[in-house]
């Protein structure tokens, strides 16, 4: 039976031949012959879209790398940092539905360009608080004169017998605190970071649904998956540079250019260190503004490829979409009125929600992104707290090792889809298999943790024994009972016995000296209390480093983390192609918009918040602001942090795997149903038995994938 590709597509959906003049999805698109000179502009659009993906991904990666810096600079808990991180998704939520639906019928490149401008200004707004806040003030021994290299010996411990009147000291201290409280207007400056990130979300809204749909509309079916894979790979390269930029800025002091760095007594390894977090946002904002330029020069539509021109729709869609071919104006039609476009909004939404494959994939992706958003947001903090690494090093290894593995995985997924021409079922199997294997590997990370740092009164007793029962007076002991110490300060000192003390005062140190930036404390009674035979009762400012075994565990963690990242990302492009192929072409942008909306609202906003709230429960020592309110966490329980962080990620990943299995089950069921319905309907057609015999072979050939009009995939 000789039919055109259009008629063959109609045969699968209407079970009858379609007249040659019937409507198809090519309505409104310029023909290949008409717009031949514009063919090269698809590559220009591909390059422009890749660059804007790079710019937005760089800013997102940089934001993740500055989570701990922002937490310390503004003295806020992890839960509030999670809300700031989620403001990007809130901005997306405000306009995503309308942008994805109406934007698909307007000038898509210009809408993307306008979004880039908003995104650029929002990114720069995040850096604004640095120029209006007071200089960063960390907890330090203020009696030391930073202008001198050697400081006379003073006693951190105010002995009862020799200290001046405590009332006079406390009076001066209270006056200072009261004055600082009046002038402390910087405590709410984090709101600008929230608003800037929200603007970033508003500006980013049109990029994914309109950009990917535009690319898929005008690329050949053979190249669509490859092009999308290229864009997604470039998008992963962005965070590499974002984390590397974050690593560089974390080494620079927050007030660089505003203070004399010779007077700074802490180093990047100190838990109170805050890097130049604001600097990277200025760079990322400029790149976003630059990315807007090419989109203002691109046309509203491009010529469709010859394969799309001939086929009109893909065979893969025909097996899973009920009645996909009906007349609707395509994105190329000009001057559609808003009311005309809005008329089909609810019917289109209803059509999407009646698609079981789309809904199940939406649920699976949402749960999986909850896992991924929470994991990525707090990964730098996890590396810092679990393995004792600096913020700069944590960002460096994520940017240089983890993210390239993700990029390679996404690119490999696109190559596999193109080379083996996988159908929807095979793509779903690859997506499911990568998730299962990836989360199984992730389980091994539970065994790669480190012991808690030995901190007197928090993780070990003052005698150095474990465990310690924490209570309100746990930081005080007989060895520091004669000292007038505050238990709210965090001025860590590493004793020669390998135990960290919350402050030199709580270590019972009676004398000290300074040479350059190094402060040596001596005659520390609590150090001798834990190691009475050593005879060396001294210590140095700063936390004690974790043992060498922890460094070895960190290397194993990196290896498993890289393999897991590659495995999970391998299913990214197959999953994306499943999303594009299970819906009607004219609803593609709208479906991508709803998908993005669901991921933003149900994963991007809540995941960092509830991850942060649960992580805060593992805090052992909170810092305090000038006015006495609670600030950011200074020390976490490593065991509790590990179980919360890894356990929650694994739990969500497991749920997403079961939902992905349901997607595959429904796909297979719909294919068998469509296949059987087609054969039954054909057998009812009034034909003579001789004609049936004559056309049987041709019909069987027609059911084989290579005879379907959209030959880009095979089941």
Swiss-Prot record:
InterPro entries: Kazal_dom (IPR002350), Kazal_dom_sf (IPR036058), MFS_dom (IPR020846), MFS_trans_sf (IPR036259), OATP (IPR004156). Its main location: membrane. GO terms for molecular function: organic anion transmembrane transporter activity; thyroid hormone transmembrane transporter activity. Residues 64-82, 135-187, 257-274, 374-393, 446-557, 616-649 are extracellular. It comes from the Eukaryota. It is found in: Cell membrane. Disulfide bonds join 479-509, 485-505, 494-526. The chain crosses the membrane at residues 44-63, 83-103, 110-134, 188-216, 236-256, 275-299, 352-373, 394-417, 422-445, 558-580, 590-615, 650-667. The keyword Glycoprotein applies. One of its GO terms (cellular component) is basolateral plasma membrane. Pfam families: Kazal_2, OATP. Residues 1-43, 104-109, 217-235, 300-351, 418-421, 581-589, 668-715 are cytoplasmic. The keyword Hydrolase does not apply. GO terms for biological process: lipid transport; monoatomic ion transport; positive regulation of thyroid hormone generation. It is a multi-pass membrane protein. Widely expressed throughout the brain except in the cerebellum. Not detected in kidney, heart, lung, skeletal muscle, spleen, liver, nor testis. Highly expressed in cerebral microvessels throughout the brain and in the choroid plexus (at mRNA and protein level). Glycans are attached at residues 452, 523, 536. It catalyses: 3,3',5'-triiodo-L-thyronine(out) = 3,3',5'-triiodo-L-thyronine(in); L-thyroxine(out) = L-thyroxine(in); L-thyroxine sulfate(out) = L-thyroxine sulfate(in); 17beta-estradiol 17-O-(beta-D-glucuronate)(out) = 17beta-estradiol 17-O-(beta-D-glucuronate)(in). Belongs to the organo anion transporter (TC 2.A.60) family. Mediates the Na(+)-independent high affinity transport of thyroid hormones at the plasma membrane of brain capillary endothelial cells. The transport activity of substrates L-thyroxine (T4) and 3,3',5'-triiodo-L-thyronine (reverse T3, rT3) is much greater than that of 3,3',5-triiodo-L-thyronine (T3). The prehormone, T4, is the major form in the circulating blood and is converted to the active form, T3, by the iodothyronine-deiodinase in peripheral organs. T3 plays an essential role in brain development via binding to specific nuclear receptors (thyroid hormone receptor). This is Solute carrier organic anion transporter family member 1C1.
């Amino acid at each position: 039976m000789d039919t055109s590709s259009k008629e063959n597509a109609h045969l699968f959906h209407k079970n009858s031949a379609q007249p040659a003049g019937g409507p198809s999805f090519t309505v409104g698109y310029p023909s290949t012959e008409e717009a031949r000179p514009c063919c090269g502009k698809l590559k220009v659009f591909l390059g422009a879209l890749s660059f804007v993906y790079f710019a937005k991904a760089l800013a997102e990666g940089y934001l993740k790398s500055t989570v701990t810096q922002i937490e310390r600079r503004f003295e806020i808990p992890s839960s509030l940092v999670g809300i700031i991180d989620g403001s990007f998704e809130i901005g997306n939520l405000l306009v995503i539905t309308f942008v994805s639906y109406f934007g698909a019928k307007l000038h898509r490149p210009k809408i993307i360009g306008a979004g880039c401008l908003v995104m650029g200004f929002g990114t720069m707004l995040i850096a604004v608080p640095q120029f209006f806040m007071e200089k960063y003030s960390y907890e330090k021994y203020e009696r030391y004169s930073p202008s001198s290299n050697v400081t006379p010996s003073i006693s951190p411990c105010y002995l009862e017998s020799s200290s001046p009147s405590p009332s006079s000291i406390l009076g001066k201290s209270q006056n200072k605190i009261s004055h600082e409280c009046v002038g402390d207007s910087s405590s709410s400056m984090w709101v600008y970071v929230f608003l800037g990130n929200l603007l970033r979300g508003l500006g980013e809204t049109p990029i994914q649904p309109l950009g990917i749909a535009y690319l898929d509309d005008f690329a050949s079916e053979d190249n669509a998956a490859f092009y999308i894979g290229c864009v997604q790979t470039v998008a992963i390269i962005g965070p590499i540079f974002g984390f590397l930029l974050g690593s560089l800025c974390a080494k620079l002091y927050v007030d660089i250019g505003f203070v004399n760095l010779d007077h700074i007594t802490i180093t990047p390894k100190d838990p109170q260190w805050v890097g130049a977090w604001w600097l990277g946002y200025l760079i990322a904002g400029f790149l976003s503004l630059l990315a807007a330029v090419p989109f203002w020069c691109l046309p509203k539509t491009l010529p469709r490829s010859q394969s799309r021109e001939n086929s009109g729709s893909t065979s893969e869609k025909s097996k899973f979409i009920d009645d996909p071919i009906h007349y609707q104006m395509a994105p190329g039609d000009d001057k559609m009125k808003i009311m005309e476009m809005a008329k089909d909004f609810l019917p289109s939404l209803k059509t999407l929600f009646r698609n079981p494959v789309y809904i199940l994939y939406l649920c699976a992706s949402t749960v999986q992104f909850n896992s991924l958003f929470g994991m990525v947001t707090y990964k730098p903090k996890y590396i810092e707290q679990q393995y004792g690494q600096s913020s700069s090093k944590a960002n460096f290894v994520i940017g240089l090792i983890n993210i390239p593995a993700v990029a390679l995985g996404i690119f490999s997924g696109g190559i596999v889809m193109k080379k083996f021409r996988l159908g929807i079922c095979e793509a779903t199997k690859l997506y499911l298999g990568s998730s299962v294997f990836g989360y199984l590997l992730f389980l091994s990370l539970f065994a790669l943790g480190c012991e808690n740092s030995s901190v007197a009164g928090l993780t070990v007793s003052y005698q150095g024994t474990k465990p310690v029962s924490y209570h309100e007076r746990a930081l005080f002991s007989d060895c520091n009972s004669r000292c007038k110490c505050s238990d709210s300060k965090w001025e860590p000192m590493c004793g020669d016995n390998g135990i960290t003390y919350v402050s030199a005062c709580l270590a019972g140190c009676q004398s000290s000296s300074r040479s350059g930036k190094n402060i040596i404390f001596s005659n520390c009674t609590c150090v001798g209390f834990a190691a009475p035979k050593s005879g060396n009762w001294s210590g140095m400012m700063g936390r004690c480093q974790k043992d060498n075994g922890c460094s070895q565990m960190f290397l194993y963690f990196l290896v498993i983390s890289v393999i897991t990242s590659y495995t999970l990302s391998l299913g990214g492009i197959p999953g994306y192609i499943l999303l594009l192929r299970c819906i009607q072409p004219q609803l593609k942008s709208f479906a991508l918009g709803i998908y993005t909306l669901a991921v933003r609202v149900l994963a991007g906003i809540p995941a960092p918040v509830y991850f942060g709230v649960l992580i805060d429960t593992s805090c052992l020592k909170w810092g305090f602001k000038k006015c006495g309110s609670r600030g950011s966490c200074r020390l976490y329980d490593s065991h509790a942090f590990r179980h919360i962080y890894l356990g929650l990620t694994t739990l969500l990943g497991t749920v997403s795997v079961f939902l992905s299995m349901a997607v595959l089950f429904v796909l297979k069921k719909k294919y068998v149903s469509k296949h059987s319905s087609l054969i039954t309907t054909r057998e009812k057609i009034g034909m003579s038995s001789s004609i049936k015999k004559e056309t049987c072979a041709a019909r069987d050939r027609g059911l084989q994938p290579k005879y379907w009009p959209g030959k880009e995939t095979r089941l």
